[in-house]
């Protein structure tokens, strides 16, 4: 039976459960009920201030609550449970636990709450504290030096609240001490009752807060002095008791102590106390002494009132309430002493002020009368910078002071002469009360001279008194003793002495711990809090403060090859000496100095500011890379204030880095980018480090913010201050660094480099060593490196001209203190001017630069409204100075001398341009862009002076200007007037526009004096010093030469190699360090395997099982270790080849740097292991493959300094594992890049690996494949099993692919890749296709069924032939295009087109080619000239002499390449085709072109200029979505192995994590072919309704990676048509990223479709006109026919359709009219006479040779007249067809039929049996013959018509036979013509033709049958047929009689089952018209040429009206036609059928 029960405390959502004894459960429950009542109602969200925030706080509050109750057992049990649960059984301290709660995001809380709920209640309940050795005290016994300090007055106004909090939290620990002290104070203070007007009962004030005096009373020194001491004693007591130590035991851990001002008393107290008794005794002495000190000081220097105005003024200026002590910060002692001297000079001695506390180098306190200190403040205000004043552009020495001065809340002038009298009184009190401190066991240091009190001969207490009252505090002296951890016991917390001391001690290795404050550590962890004292942990870890000198000072290291380096953070980062050359224009623009510096072993920056385009910079970088040692990297410097350059510079760097260029760093000068921009640089550019050059304290802060945002990325902070050469700030070099050094060093990733003013080892060594700062009274502040600029300008490799170099040597320079004089005058040969960017810039004070300075001071500083006036006034002076002294002379110059531009002739302008921009001496232009500018000006001259149009330009190419003098002379001979004509105003503007044109080199002259003068004067002003030949008179004094005023001191030689300059400095540093650090013994320098790169890290990965033996085994289960820790673990701590290989960030490939693949390959994987042989260091990695742990990576040293990395793949074609070997050279001489890949045969090794992978190890590897020949694949029989496995792998569930009996089993289109894989993939193996297969990307894939070919199916025997269509070098890599053709029984079935891309950069153009089937082009010839141009082309061969207006060209080309833009050869051949009017296409010519080196293809150029492409797809304006997309969501497979197996594509990037990692892929990417197949299956389903055969083509581009289990969403849209097939656009996106992964296009055949053309009867006015207006194609059909009608028959068919006139007159005037009349006369038709004989008659009997006009008349409109109806309807249908055909809507294999008249439209449209003109002739003739075939009255009306009949409307039983019966009997009975002529829809729609009377009779007979419900069918069953006829005749007779009685001709009306066809007055298709058949047949024969009838267009497609069956070319079909027609021609064919076979 359990003896415990769970007991739960809850508050809102917070709960805590503990097990309590059964016998106490009731008591617990009672206490809980009472406790809950004390809690407020729970709040939602964050807990309120009075609520517990966590289970621990809830439990703590409960423990505090029950500690007041009478249940000691419960308290004890609960406390034990609390300690067990939260304090790890007291292995953790309550303070540490409380601080941890502050970082708990689950239960947010505050420091106040954890103090109240945790700390207070814990100590309320705890009865005893065991002795615990904290981590800190443990280290005190070993390596830590712990000291204690105590503060003084003035830290805070509310110091008493600190004591109150202590009493609240730790009452039980300090109660006894406080009682004793309170008693002592109560004994003493009555003696000073006039002072202690409100008493001194501190215990009462603590217990009863309402009795606490006001703040003024508490701040009075008699009260504050003893109470502050009480606070410190309490803190000390709490510390000892929490640790379980006596004061003596804790003191033994302290090395020394001291106190600030009165804090000395407490320091002496703890030093003299070795037990609680002695501590109490000494504590009472201390508070007694301080009571006397406070009282006597006040009585000696009483507090007096101040004038209200003084008080208010002081408060208004933020200086606080005047008191006897004033804090002054951020001024040096010298500066403050100067102000004191000024102030005291106006005061009597007793009012003097003095420095009383020197807290730090720039932290002082003054003591004196408040009025005097107020006067000091007034004096300081005059020179103090107001808040917000921007002084960044003011020289540092001239700036107003930035400082803080504020009165302290201390009301006695401590540490000054003003308290001398108080000293004596205090000492009397001491003697009177017998106070003393004896037996100090640890040093306590004097605050005046830093001496040890233990050595004092006078009484310690006497010295203490004097140190508090009179002697100034030198706090740095007092604390200048060894310490690693300093405990500040208050008061004041973060406002107290600890933080002040931290500022002094920062960087010295002393960590400040605020022993009196509990809080979480600050963000930067600058100092610690109370909990650090008590922290306990198994690892005994404590925090240490940085020691700048120890950690950052330079040391030496020697690599395995004996080379010595100065080791700093900078040199460790670079693996080079810690010296660099800064990017500076123009010096480091040139590649010589950059290459030389790098090869000498020193980092240097290419000055990007000297380049104006990406091409220029790339060319320079290529040059550098080709000249430097492999592994070396360069830096690039860009100017932040030049946004134009950044716009192209940053993308260029990114692009080059991605290509592997060894660009190591980017430095941004002249501004610090924002964090966002810097982040882009850091994350996107692939740099080793980012250099930033801040120019001010604020800018340094920006750099720090950037570094903090990227704590693991190196930021090189280059500090140059204002003394640097070239552009510079206004800053002092030292002061900003002193101010910001500690903040900089808190960012471990910042590398600090000093620059400017340096030139030797001697002047730079103090900065590397850090001792430079000591002269400013700061601890050593080492820099990590030094940069040089001016110093290298005279180097041999510098392009600085010799004269400029000599001028630099002549400059003497100045020391640091004098450089600011350059702002006003030449100093050391240097002066500051304002650059084009408005920034200060140092230049040598040449004549030209002094003129620049003059203009800066007199012209360029003027506002715009005064500028022009000043320029005009000084015009002559400025022009003279330009011509005599400056590098850019005045442009204007004519025969008379100096002039303005507008006073020059065109020729003079041209000559002047040549004079100033062309360097005659060396026969070159200053820059090619200036040559081109000159060319543009000459072309303007040509435009002005060329008199005739069509004149060929003299300047065809700018290269003609390479020697401009002769060309210019010849040029102006052609245009003599240009030598006389002054340049026009318009051309002046054009000239100035050219001169200022962006993108070209700025002009070397000044053309104008206006607001643009400064631009022309200053722009591009630095290059001249490097190219004196281009300067007038080669006068160096005209030029601008950048140089630093301080650095100038060190340049004494000309043409010293840069390597020698830098080596001498580096070797000087080495010699100095050997002497100082290694006692002159070089052998003591530590030796390492290599130097540079990452330091080895000692780590312990907790989730890794390590087995140690002959080989170390590292095993990973399901929990993964941190990647970096894992790599560090594998690398080990020993520097060797394996450590270098694993840890290096870069691998050298040739001249390129690529990221280390091991970082990805060795990424920790679940259930894997790694073994490392201890002896050989061979590493083998194993991973789980199908349940087995198999080796996947091996790394070993195969021979000295040669490493082999093998990647092993087990999933192969023959299942045998294959290894891919990579070879590397280990170069320990270069620690920055110690691993160089051996590139020889690398690609071949990779190809051989893939060959074995895809084809099997038994197939011999061969790269001897001819790229110009077809690659043959194996013959394969398609089986149902392979189809099934494939469809299963891709998830295609289409029924067509399922093997079932009785049907063919189709193979998916994608199956072609399985068939053709080996042939297609062999195309990437030829030796000439050289590329890295691991960088191969499948770009696209496409399938296309051959026209007419059936899909692949089971049982097909197929083979593949692959052809390489293209091998192209592109910017993104090498493109290989392969077309594989699948053959079945020797016939092509399908084409598979795949494009692959070898990512990278390739230049082997000799191996590249492209075979192109050019897009067919039609060329229209509008003139004889056009024809002549074509005939003149050598490549055009006309083979038939025919007339043509339009030709079609179908060509194929083969291109071979010489370079990216030049072909080595071109061959183009093809057919030239002509379409005849009959639509027949014949070849009339050919194209045959072949050429060698070419820049273009003249054939395609001609066709693209003159023609238009055809056979292109037609894209809809608005796409039609096929699905919403949601239902097309799919998931990528979790593994790619099934597809790899069925497809044969074993590329390991799809199945192997290791290979995918090597290829820099985010995972094993899904096969592109799988994605293609699975998405195509969706197309099959959604766009082809699961009819597989309808998908005729599918192509897709793989635009994004798909990873296992990715969720994909596909959308489909019907976007257009091509040749009658739907174009379906497919897009598949990754659902999570929303990025596209596949974009495809499918061609879907439409379902079997028959096109039907309507007949007569459907016409209406305006028909087809909407389409006519919107479709160009339709309009062309109408217009062509209309022209034919107008020209041949004199009327417009368009007019008839649009307006439907009732009559139309044709006039026969003129020759054209007569020809039209002849056409009418010639129209004949044949009829059968009464005698039965055939006779011919004119259709238009009224027209003869004398007729002048003819009028067509129709009462219902001419459109209803048959002769017009028929051509109009035919044209409407033809136009509609041609329109949809033009839109690609017509499939190639369709059936068609025409209803009646529509048969003509059908045949002419789909079978092209006649041109449009013949078509309209035929139907017009047909209409006319029919129109005249029936008699008509005078109104043109006939007695014939047609009706539509629906028998089903008569009755349900009235069917086809019934209708036929009734029609026949009506005809028989009436003898009128009545026939069914159209059988449209059985039982529903028929058309009857005949006599109107007969039609009317039929209508009404059917009405009678319906009304009377007479069932003819039933009657036929019930009686004989004769009887039925008899009854029917009765009805017919009655109805016919009524029809005869109606007005004739009858106007037919609608019946129940009959609808009249209005407008038809001819009995079409009836026997009545039989006589017209033969003549019409003869007419048709004339109009339909035999050549236009193509059987293939008719067989199986054309459904004639006659047969209602698809046309066949068979004897049976012809027989059926004969049976229907009795045609003699058909009979003749049948009789002679054998002849036709």
Curated annotation (Swiss-Prot):
[Alpha(6)beta(6)] hexamers of two multifunctional subunits (alpha and beta). The lineage of its organism: Eukaryota, Fungi, Dikarya, Ascomycota, Saccharomycotina. The active site is at residues 261, 1796. Residues 1-453 are annotated as: Acetyltransferase. The gene is FAS1. The keyword Transferase applies. This is Fatty acid synthase subunit beta. The keyword Lipid metabolism applies. One of its GO terms (biological process) is long-chain fatty acid biosynthetic process. Keywords: Fatty acid biosynthesis, Fatty acid metabolism, Hydrolase, Lipid biosynthesis, Lipid metabolism, Lyase, Multifunctional enzyme, NAD, NADP, Oxidoreductase, Transferase. Residues 1506-1634 form the MaoC-like domain.
């Amino acid at each position: 039976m359990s003896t415990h029960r769970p007991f739960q405390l809850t508050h809102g959502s917070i709960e805590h459960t503990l097990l309590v004894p059964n016998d106490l459960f009731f008591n617990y429950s009672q206490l809980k009920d009472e406790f809950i009542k004390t809690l407020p109602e729970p709040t939602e969200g964050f807990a309120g201030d009075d609520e517990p925030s966590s289970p621990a706080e809830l439990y703590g509050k409960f423990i505090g609550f029950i500690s007041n109750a009478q249940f000691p057992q419960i308290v004890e049990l609960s406390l034990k449970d609390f300690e067990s649960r939260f304090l790890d059984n007291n292995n953790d301290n309550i303070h540490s636990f409380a601080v941890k709660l502050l970082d708990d995001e689950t239960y947010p809380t505050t420091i106040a709450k954890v103090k109240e709920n945790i700390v207070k209640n814990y100590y309320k309940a705890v009865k005893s504290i065991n002795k615990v050795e904290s981590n800190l005290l443990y280290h005190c016994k070993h390596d830590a030096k712990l000291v204690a300090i105590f503060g003084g007055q003035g830290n805070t106004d509310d110091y008493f609240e600190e004591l109150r909090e202590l009493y609240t939290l730790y009452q039980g620990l300090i109660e006894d001490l406080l009682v004793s002290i309170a008693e002592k104070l109560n004994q003493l203070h009555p003696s000073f009752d006039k002072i202690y007007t409100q008493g001194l009962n501190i215990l009462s004030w603590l217990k009863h807060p309402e009795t606490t005096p006001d703040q003024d009373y508490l701040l009075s020194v008699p009260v504050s002095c003893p109470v502050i001491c009480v606070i410190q004693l309490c803190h000390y007591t709490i510390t000892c008791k929490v640790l379980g130590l006596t004061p003596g035991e804790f003191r033994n851990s302290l090395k020394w102590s001291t106190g600030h001002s009165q804090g000395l008393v407490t320091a002496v107290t703890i030093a003299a106390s070795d037990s609680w008794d002695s501590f109490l005794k000494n504590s009472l002495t201390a508070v007694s002494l301080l009571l006397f000190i406070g009282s006597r000081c006040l009585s000696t220097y009483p507090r007096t009132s101040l004038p209200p105005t003084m008080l208010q003024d002081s408060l208004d200026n933020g200086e606080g309430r005047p008191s006897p002590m004033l804090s002054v910060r951020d001024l040096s002692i010298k500066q403050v002493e100067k102000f004191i001297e000024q102030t005291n000079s106006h005061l009597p001695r007793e009012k003097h002020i003095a420095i009383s506390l020197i807290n730090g180098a720039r932290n002082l306190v003054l003591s004196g009368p408040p009025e005097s200190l107020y006067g000091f403040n007034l004096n300081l205000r005059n020179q103090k910078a107001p808040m917000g004043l921007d002084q960044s552009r003011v020289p540092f020495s001239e700036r107003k002071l930035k400082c803080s001065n504020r009165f302290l809340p201390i009301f006695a002038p401590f540490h000054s002469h003003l308290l001398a009298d108080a000293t004596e009184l205090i000492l009397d009190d001491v003697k009177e009360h017998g106070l003393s401190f004896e037996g100090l066991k640890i040093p306590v240091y004097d605050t005046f001279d830093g001496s040890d009190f233990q050595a004092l001969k006078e009484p310690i207490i006497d010295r203490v008194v004097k140190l508090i009252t009179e002697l100034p505090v030198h706090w740095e002296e007092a604390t200048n003793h060894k310490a690693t951890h300093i405990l500040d016991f208050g008061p004041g917390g973060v406002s107290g002495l600890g933080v002040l001391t931290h500022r002094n001690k920062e960087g010295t290795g002393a960590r400040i711990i605020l022993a009196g404050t509990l809080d979480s550590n600050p963000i930067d962890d600058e100092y610690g809090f109370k909990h650090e004292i008590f922290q306990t942990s198994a690892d005994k870890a404590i925090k240490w403060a940085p020691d700048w000198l120890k950690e950052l000072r330079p040391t030496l290291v020697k690599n395995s090859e004996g080379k010595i380096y100065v080791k700093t953070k900078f040199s460790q980062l670079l693996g080079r000496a810690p010296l660099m050359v800064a990017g500076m224009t123009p010096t480091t623009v040139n590649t010589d100095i950059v290459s030389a510096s790098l090869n000498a072993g020193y980092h240097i920056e290419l000055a990007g500011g000297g380049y104006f385009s990406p091409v220029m910079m790339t060319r320079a970088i290529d040059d550098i890379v080709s000249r430097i040692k492999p592994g070396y990297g360069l830096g690039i410097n860009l100017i932040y204030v030049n946004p134009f350059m950044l716009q192209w510079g940053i993308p260029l760097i990114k692009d080059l880095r991605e290509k592997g260029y060894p660009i190591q760093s980017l430095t941004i000068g002249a501004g610090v980018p924002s964090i966002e921009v810097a982040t882009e640089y850091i994350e996107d550019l692939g740099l080793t480090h980012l250099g930033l050059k801040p120019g001010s304290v604020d800018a340094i802060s920006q750099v720090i913010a950037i570094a903090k945002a990227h704590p693991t990325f190196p930021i090189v902070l280059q500090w140059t201050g204002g003394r640097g050469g070239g552009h510079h700030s206004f800053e002092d070099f030292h002061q900003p660094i002193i101010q910001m050094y500690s903040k900089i060093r808190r960012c471990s990733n910042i590398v600090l480099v000093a620059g400017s003013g340096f030139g030797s080892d001697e002047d730079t060594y103090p900065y590397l060593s850090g001792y430079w700062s000591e002269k400013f009274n700061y601890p050593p502040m080492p820099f990590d490196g030094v940069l040089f600029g001016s110093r290298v300008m005279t180097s041999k490799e510098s392009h600085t001209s010799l004269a400029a170099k000599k001028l630099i040597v002549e400059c003497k320079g100045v020391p640091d203190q004098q450089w600011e004089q350059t702002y006003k005058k030449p100093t050391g040969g240097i002066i500051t001017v304002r650059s084009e960017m408005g920034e200060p810039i140092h230049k040598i004070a040449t004549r030209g630069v002094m003129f620049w300075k003059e203009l800066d001071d007199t012209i360029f500083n003027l506002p715009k409204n005064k500028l022009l006036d000043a320029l005009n006034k000084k015009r002559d002076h400025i022009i003279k100075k330009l011509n005599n002294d400056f590098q850019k002379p005045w442009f204007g110059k004519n025969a008379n001398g100096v002039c303005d531009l507008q006073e020059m002739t065109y020729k003079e302008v041209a000559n002047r341009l040549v004079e100033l921009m062309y360097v005659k001496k060396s026969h070159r232009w200053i820059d090619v862009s200036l040559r081109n500018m000159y060319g543009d000006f000459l072309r303007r001259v040509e435009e002005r002076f060329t008199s005739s149009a069509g004149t060929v330009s003299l300047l065809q190419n700018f290269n003609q200007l390479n020697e401009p003098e002769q060309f210019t002379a010849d040029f102006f001979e052609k245009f003599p007037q240009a030598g006389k004509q002054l340049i026009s105003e318009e051309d002046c503007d054009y000239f100035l526009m050219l001169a200022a044109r962006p993108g070209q080199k700025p002009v070397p002259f000044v053309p104008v004096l206006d607001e643009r003068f400064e631009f022309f004067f200053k722009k591009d002003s630095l290059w001249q010093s490097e190219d004196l030949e281009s300067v007038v008179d080669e006068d160096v004094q005209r030029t601008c030469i950048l140089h630093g005023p301080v650095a100038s001191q060190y340049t004494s030689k000309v043409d010293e190699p840069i390597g020698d300059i830098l080596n001498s400095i580096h070797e000087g540093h080495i010699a100095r360090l050997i002497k100082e650090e290694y006692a002159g013994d070089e052998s003591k320098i530590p030796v390492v395997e290599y130097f540079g790169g990452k330091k080895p890290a000692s780590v312990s990965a907790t989730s890794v099982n390590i087995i140690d033996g002959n080989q170390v085994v590292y095993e990973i289960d399901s929990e993964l270790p941190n990647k970096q820790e894992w790599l560090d673990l594998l690398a080990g701590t020993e520097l060797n080849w394996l450590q270098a290989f694993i840890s290096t960030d870069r691998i050298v490939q040739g001249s390129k740097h690529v990221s280390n693949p091991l970082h990805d390959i060795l990424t920790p994987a679940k259930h894997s292991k790694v073994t490392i042989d201890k002896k050989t260091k061979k590493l083998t990695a194993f991973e789980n493959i199908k349940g087995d742990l198999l080796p996947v990576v091996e790394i070993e040293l195969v021979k000295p300094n040669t490493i082999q990395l093998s990647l092993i793949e087990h999933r192969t074609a023959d299942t045998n594992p294959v290894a891919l070997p990579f070879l590397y050279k280990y170069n320990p001489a270069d620690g920055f890049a110690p691993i160089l890949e051996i590139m020889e045969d690398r690609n071949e090794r990779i190809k051989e690996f893939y060959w074995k992978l895809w084809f099997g190890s038994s197939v011999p590897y061969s790269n001897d494949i001819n790229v110009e020949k077809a690659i043959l694949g194996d013959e394969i029989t398609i089986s149902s099993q392979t189809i099934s496995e494939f469809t299963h792998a891709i998830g295609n569930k289409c029924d067509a692919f399922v093997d079932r009996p009785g049907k063919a089993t189709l193979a998916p289109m994608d199956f072609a890749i399985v068939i053709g894989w080996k042939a297609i993939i062999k195309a990437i193996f030829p030796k000439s296709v050289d590329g890295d297969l691991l960088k191969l990307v499948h770009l696209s894939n496409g399938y296309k069924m051959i026209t007419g070919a059936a899909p692949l199916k089971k049982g097909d025997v197929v083979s593949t032939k692959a052809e390489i269509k293209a091998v192209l070098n592109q910017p993104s890599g090498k493109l290989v295009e392969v077309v594989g053709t699948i053959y079945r029984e020797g016939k092509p079935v399908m084409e598979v087109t795949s494009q692959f891309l070898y990512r990278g950069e390739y230049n082997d153009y000799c191996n590249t080619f492209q075979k192109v089937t050019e897009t067919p082009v039609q060329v229209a010839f509008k003139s004889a000239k056009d024809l002549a141009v074509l005939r003149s082309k050598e490549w055009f061969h006309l083979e038939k002499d025919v007339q043509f207006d339009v030709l079609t060209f179908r060509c194929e080309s083969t291109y071979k390449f010489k370079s990216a833009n030049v072909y080595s050869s071109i061959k183009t051949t093809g057919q030239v085709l002509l379409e005849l009017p009959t639509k027949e296409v014949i070849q009339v010519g050919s194209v045959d072109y072949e050429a060698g080196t070419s820049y273009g293809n003249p054939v395609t150029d001609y066709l693209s200029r003159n023609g238009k492409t055809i056979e292109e797809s037609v894209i809809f304006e608005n796409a039609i979505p096929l699905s919403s997309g949601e239902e097309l969501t799919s998931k990528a497979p979790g593994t790619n192995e099934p597809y790899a197996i069925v497809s044969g594509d074993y590329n390991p990037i799809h199945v192997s994590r290791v290979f995918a990692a090597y290829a820099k892929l985010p995972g094993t990417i899904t096969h592109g072919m799988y994605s293609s197949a699975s998405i195509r299956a969706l197309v099959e389903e959604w766009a082809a309704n699961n009819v597989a055969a309808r998908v005729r083509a599918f192509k897709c581009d793989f635009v994004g990676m798909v990873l296992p289990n990715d969720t994909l969403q596909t959308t489909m849209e019907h976007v257009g048509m091509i040749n009658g097939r739907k174009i379906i656009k497919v897009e598949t996106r990754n659902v999570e990223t929303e990025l596209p992964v596949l974009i495809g296009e499918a061609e879907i055949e439409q379902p079997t479709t028959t096109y039907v053309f309507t007949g007569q009867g459907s016409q209406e006015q305006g028909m087809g006109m909407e389409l006519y207006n919107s479709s160009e194609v339709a309009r062309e059909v109408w217009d062509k026919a209309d022209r034919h009608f107008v020209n041949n028959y004199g009327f417009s068919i368009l007019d008839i359709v649009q307006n439907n006139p009732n009559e139309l007159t044709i006039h026969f005037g003129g020759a054209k009219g007569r020809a039209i009349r002849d056409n009418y006369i010639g129209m004949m038709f044949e009829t059968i006479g009464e005698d039965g004989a055939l006779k011919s008659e004119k259709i238009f009997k009224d027209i003869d040779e004398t007729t002048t006009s003819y009028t067509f008349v129709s009462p219902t409109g001419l459109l209803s007249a048959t002769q017009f109806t028929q051509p109009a309807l035919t044209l409407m249908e033809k136009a509609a067809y041609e329109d949809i055909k033009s839109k690609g809507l017509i499939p190639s294999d369709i059936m068609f039929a025409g209803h009646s008249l529509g048969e003509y439209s059908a045949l002419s449209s789909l079978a092209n049996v006649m041109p449009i003109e013949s078509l309209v002739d035929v139907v017009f003739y047909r209409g006319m013959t029919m129109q005249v075939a029936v008699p008509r009255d005078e109104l043109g009306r006939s007695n014939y018509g047609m009706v539509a009949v629906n028998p089903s409307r008569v009755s349900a039983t009235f069917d086809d036979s019934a209708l036929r019966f009734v029609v026949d009997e009506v005809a028989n009975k009436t003898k009128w013509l009545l026939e069914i002529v159209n059988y449209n829809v059985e039982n529903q729609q028929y058309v009857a033709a005949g006599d109107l009377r007969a039609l009317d009779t039929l209508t009404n007979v059917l009405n009678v049958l319906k009304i009377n419900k007479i069932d003819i069918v039933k009657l036929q069953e019930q009686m004989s047929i004769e009887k039925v006829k008899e009854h029917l005749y009765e009805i017919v007779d009655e109805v016919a009689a009524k029809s005869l009685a109606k007005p004739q001709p009858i106007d037919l009306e609608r019946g129940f089952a009959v609808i009249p066809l209005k407008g038809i007055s001819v009995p079409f298709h009836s026997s009545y018209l039989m006589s017209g058949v033969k003549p019409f047949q003869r007419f048709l024969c004339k109009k339909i040429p035999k050549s236009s009838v193509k059987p293939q267009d008719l067989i199986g497609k054309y459904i004639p009206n006659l047969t209602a069956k698809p046309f066949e070319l068979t004897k049976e079909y012809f027989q059926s036609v004969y049976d229907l027609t009795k045609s003699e021609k058909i009979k003749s064919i049948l009789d002679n059928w054998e002849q036709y076979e």
